[in-house]
Amino acid sequence: MATSWGSILQDEKQLEELAQQAIDRALAEGVLLRSAKNPSSSDVVTYAPFTLFPSPVPSTLLEQAYAVQMDFNILVDAVSQNSAFLEQTLSSTIKKDEYTARLFDIYKQVLKEGIAQTVFLGLNRSDYMFQCSADGSKALKQIEINTISASFGGLASRTPAVHRHVLNVLNKTNEASKILSNNPSKGLALGIAKAWELYGSANAVVLLIAQEKERNIFDQRAIENELLDRKIHVIRRRFEDVSERGSLDQNRRLFMEDQEVAVVYFRDGYMPSQYNAQNWEARLLLERSCAAKCPDIATQLAGTKKVQQELSRVGLLEALLPGQPEAVARLRATFAGLYSLDMGEEGDQAVAEALAAPSHFVLKPQREGGGNNFYGEEMVHALEQLKDSEERASYILMEKIEPEPFRNCLLRPGSPAQVVQCISELGIFGVYVRQGTTLVMNKHVGHLLRTKAIEHADGGVAAGVAVLDNPYPV
């Protein structure tokens, strides 16, 4: 996948000058993070790491990823409403994975009491890599779907201008014009705004559940600002604040410091380390309320790796999406090989295959946030320890995707520009809103491309491994 700027990657002096221009433009555009040293303050900020050039992406695969996103929205929503499927699918996992078990306990409590909310909001991001076959052909393969705190929609809205600027500096105006416009933050905000509107209280606010130390604040502010432009107010609070000052009235309306809450938007609560006893209490309070949660706990469970693995079983998509054979075909075309590690013959066979050919598999726990997976020798060591234990049921095995590497230059604060062999991961943002049983919004709202050096097996931008990028359609 050659590009017309490949030769510049060998010119150190030109690269240095161009990198400085790109960094200045990124700062001017608001491609920003708080500093690692002081993540609670915006007094000192830095640019978010990014590629100097956009990276080549096959245009047919980009189109395919967009085309299937609304199917994934419908699928996630269907799974979240199917309590029998969730219970059956997660039954082995919750025996050995304490975090998933705690989420499931809250889910069961809310089901027993009766779900109070009538408006349901999904903001998700489906992530893919491009599998490269021996004959050079490429296929879109889903890595995962993020149903909680799907990030970088705000910063991804600001990076196209940076890459257009770089190419314009090089007099590559034709190439610059091919960089797609992209504004996920606007689309994500439209989903929140629709849920807020359907809740039906003009004075109610959106409650954003935030971490105390949040480097990625500007990503979140982009969505907040879009909402404020629509006269919808956002309050940022931590789980601790909800525990201390949140309450439900007799109709289970949620109040935060006497302000009624229409929508709860989680940008925290997706990893075990983000919960203590007080935070679990706060999560239960939020779930019991009639506010629209993004996501509600059923939708968070629908995004687990175990659910992803079960959805790949023959006949399951057909059962969940009856009468929709075209959608089923589009979805199934993106599935990589996924294998259960539940106790029994099927799980034993999967373990044996992975130990025999470790370079072909990835071991995945039920975790979000990046940097949790096991590869190669590390995977072999983990499987040797897990293979005879019921704990293995809290993991899944996935076929390892092998994309075609390409050269690009990675720009990171405090580091010299680095020209390396890279691979990319494409995310498509999806938004849906359901009122009762009626789907009132279902759309794709933009993309995110993240790129990393090939030696890094796992991890995203927040984990310090990948950098922000833009697709250059080829």
Swiss-Prot record:
Keywords: Acetylation, ATP-binding, Glutathione biosynthesis, Ligase, Magnesium, Metal-binding, Nucleotide-binding, Phosphoprotein
CDD domains named in the record: eu-GS
Cofactor(s) it depends on: Mg(2+)
UniProt: ATP binding residues: 144, 305, 364-373, 375, 398-401, 425, 452, 458
Cofactor note: Binds 1 Mg(2+) ion per subunit.
GO MF annotations, alphabetized: ATP binding; glutathione binding; glutathione synthase activity; glycine binding; identical protein binding; magnesium ion binding; peptide binding; protein homodimerization activity
Residues binding Mg(2+), per UniProt: 144, 146, 368
Broadest EC class assigned to this enzyme: ligase
Binding site for substrate: 125, 148-151, 214-216, 220, 267-270, 450, 461-462
Top-rank taxon, per record: Eukaryota
GO biological process: glutathione biosynthetic process; response to amino acid; response to cadmium ion; response to nutrient levels; response to tumor necrosis factor; response to xenobiotic stimulus
Pathway listed: Sulfur metabolism; glutathione biosynthesis; glutathione from L-cysteine and L-glutamate: step 2/2
Pfam families reported in the protein's UniProt record: GSH_synth_ATP, GSH_synthase
GO CC annotation, single: cytosol
Catalysis: reaction(s): gamma-L-glutamyl-L-cysteine + glycine + ATP = glutathione + ADP + phosphate + H(+); gamma-L-glutamyl-(2S)-2-aminobutanoate + glycine + ATP = ophthalmate + ADP + phosphate + H(+)
InterPro entries in the record: Glutathione_synthase, Glutathione_synthase_a-hlx, Glutathione_synthase_C_euk, Glutathione_synthase_N_euk, GSH-S_sub-bd_sf, GSH_synth_subst-bd, PreATP-grasp_dom_sf
Residues with PTM N-acetylalanine: 2
Modified positions (Phosphoserine) in chain numbering: 415
Subunit comment: Homodimer.
Record function comment: Catalyzes the production of glutathione from gamma-glutamylcysteine and glycine in an ATP-dependent manner. Glutathione (gamma-glutamylcysteinylglycine, GSH) is the most abundant intracellular thiol in living aerobic cells and is required for numerous processes including the protection of cells against oxidative damage, amino acid transport, the detoxification of foreign compounds, the maintenance of protein sulfhydryl groups in a reduced state and acts as a cofactor for a number of enzymes. Participates in ophthalmate biosynthesis in hepatocytes.
Protein family (similarity comment): Belongs to the eukaryotic GSH synthase family.
PANTHER family: GLUTATHIONE SYNTHETASE
Protein name as annotated: Glutathione synthetase
